[in-house]
Amino acid sequence: MALLKVKFDQKKRVKLAQGLWLMNWLSVLAGIVIFSLGLFLKIELRKRSDVMNNSESHFVPNSLIGMGVLSCVFNSLAGKICYDALDPSKYAKWKPWLKSYLVVCVLFNIVLFLVALCCFLMRGSLESTLAQGLKNGMKYYRDTDTPGRCFMKKTIDLLQIEFKCCGNNGFRDWFEIQWISNRYLDFSSKEVKDRIKSNVDGRYLVDGVPFSCCNPNSPRPCIQYQLTNNSAHYSYDHQTEELNLWVRGCRAALLSYYGSLMNSMGAVTLLVWLFEVSITIGLRYLHTALEGVSNPEDLECESEGWLLEKSVSETWKAFLESLKKLGKSNQVEAEGADAGQAPEAG
């Protein structure tokens, strides 16, 4: 028995075709939106590629771009089919291909749903990518004279200013690396020598941070050196006083930014997916309603449209059986090819 059967007369078929035509062209616009979102995300990821590990994935933006293009193509074609469905002579050329086209639409909807899920799940992979990338970027902060790394200081400073953050997980990350170039160290100074000797790796470590970590909203002039030395500053206690630095780490700031982007894009993609599913269902009803017209010359006759020709369980069984038959036919062809090669070998 057909699933969700609906009766159609000529007036209802025309209204369905016209409604689907309009929905398809709206979906073309939605496809352009998805394409634009994917392009925007790709550009934003490229902007921060210097503070991301080399393994950062552009799968999600590339998928959004691809699905946006496919949405425009498929819905333009579906709009043409719906327009021609009003004319029996024009619809005849689409009739042999419509069932296959519906299968392609179902596959497209499945992939679109998976892409929407990927938008929500990208945060995990992005977190590890940012953690390693920011760590490397901070390590190369001092290499202003090294070709290929001379831009890293400017990149990190602009990042910390724009996102109001400091370090990877926090400002103390700067205490663990030498971020001042040897070029600007006075090696004749006893303080510099003592600091380098006190470190196992021979690095010049200080309890200070770059200027870009300073919070301009603080009423006190920025304290960026000797942050843990209370006696170095008047009326200062680093354990109890709120420092005039950005407290949040840049990894958390970037994750928050990209996370909000991905959630918004995932929500938009899900809405487009729901719209595409409704179009596919409408196309299925239009297809079965037109197929059910008993007398093509009598356009006023009633017909029945349905979503599935059989129940869900029966349709699933038929699908599994078709897969088994396909597998057996491939196996027979392979055995026939092996048998044909055996006499030649003899």
From Swiss-Prot:
GO terms for cellular component: photoreceptor inner segment; photoreceptor outer segment; plasma membrane. Gene3D superfamilies: Tetraspanin (1.10.1450.10). The keyword Transmembrane helix applies. Residues 341-346 are annotated as: Interaction with MREG. Residues 1-24, 81-99, 291-346 are cytoplasmic. It comes from the Eukaryota. Keywords: Cell adhesion, Cell projection, Disulfide bond, Glycoprotein, Membrane, Sensory transduction, Transmembrane, Transmembrane helix, Vision. Retina (photoreceptor). In rim region of ROS (rod outer segment) disks. It is a multi-pass membrane protein. Residues 44-61, 124-264 are lumenal. Glycans are attached at residues 53, 229. Belongs to the PRPH2/ROM1 family. Essential for retina photoreceptor outer segment disk morphogenesis, may also play a role with ROM1 in the maintenance of outer segment disk structure. Required for the maintenance of retinal outer nuclear layer thickness. Required for the correct development and organization of the photoreceptor inner segment. Homodimer; disulfide-linked. Forms a homotetramer. Forms a heterotetramer with ROM1. Homotetramer and heterotetramer core complexes go on to form higher order complexes by formation of intermolecular disulfide bonds. Interacts with MREG. Interacts with STX3. Interacts with SNAP25. PANTHER family: PERIPHERIN-2, TETRASPANIN. This is Peripherin-2. It comes from Felis catus. The lineage of its organism: Eukaryota, Metazoa, Chordata, Craniata, Vertebrata.
